[in-house]
Amino acid sequence: YLLAEHYGIDYEKKGISVRGHIYWAEYEENVEDDYALLSFDTESAWSSCDLFFEEVNKALGDELSISWREVEPGFDIFYTHDENDFFPEECYVTAYGELFEDCEGAYSTFGDAIKLWCEKTGVSQDGRSEQKMIDFINEYEYEAEDTNFCINPITFG
């Protein structure tokens, strides 16, 4: 909410959620190419802060190009709005359990996620198409109940 107050955005009146916080930020500038990039990660509740970003952009004279990725596995939200190819990944893996420690995250291709799963489990793709393999992995039943690996497509828009 501090950023909203700084730019004079009446988020309550406009019904814009500002729940959450910015937990990482970085600024890069290339004067030669007339290019500046402000990157940050936010932790918000259930959905992206895109309406808020649009209001900040208006306050700055519509000078920004805004790209973002929204991930909320508990609600099956895997969405990217990308004006500059900052988020080219095709899928997001949700994973837990000892077998899949450090596997959760975005992957460049479905094939990369499938390959990782095959390496971790020792199960071969065995001629299955990419989509058949994704279905196979997402429906796979593990011996340990606290283990799962799911390949989720990222929707672009």
State what each model feature region is.
Residues 1-157:
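Intrinsic low-complexity, intrinsically disordered or marginally ordered coil/linker segments
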